[in-house]
Swiss-Prot record:
The keyword Signal does not apply. GO terms for molecular function: DNA binding; DNA-directed RNA polymerase activity. GO terms for biological process: DNA-templated transcription. This is DNA-directed RNA polymerase subunit epsilon. It catalyses: RNA(n) + a ribonucleoside 5'-triphosphate = RNA(n+1) + diphosphate. HAMAP family: RNApol_bact_RpoY. It comes from the Bacteria. RNAP is composed of a core of 2 alpha, a beta and a beta' subunit. The core is associated with a delta subunit, and at least one of epsilon or omega. When a sigma factor is associated with the core the holoenzyme is formed, which can initiate transcription. It comes from Lactiplantibacillus plantarum (strain ATCC BAA-793 / NCIMB 8826 / WCFS1) (Lactobacillus plantarum). GO terms for cellular component: DNA-directed RNA polymerase complex. Belongs to the RNA polymerase subunit epsilon family. It is an enzyme of class 2 (transferase). Keywords: DNA-directed RNA polymerase, Nucleotidyltransferase, Transcription, Transferase.
């Protein structure tokens, strides 16, 4: 499944909506998606949203859409 992960670049500051960023990744579960991001970045994860159906189609039309892959 594809997940959209909303995050802040650092855990040092409190989250601010204006500085929230996102990435897309493929994982088996939401827990696996969180683990991938936590193990490979210093990001402060705010929310993980599963994408499927019309929601995924909409996101894929965004020019910023690309799947993030981490080296294992």
């Amino acid at each position: 499944m594809i997940y959209k992960v909303y995050y802040q670049e650092t855990k040092e500051r409190n989250p601010q909506r204006e500085t929230t960023q996102s990435l897309y990744l493929e994982a088996e579960t939401e827990v696996a998606a969180r683990t991938l991001v936590e193990d490979n970045t210093d990001h402060n994860i705010e929310f993980i949203e599963p994408l499927e159906g019309n929601f995924l189609d909409y996101e894929q039309k965004n020019p910023e859409y690309h799947l993030t892959e981490f080296n294992k």
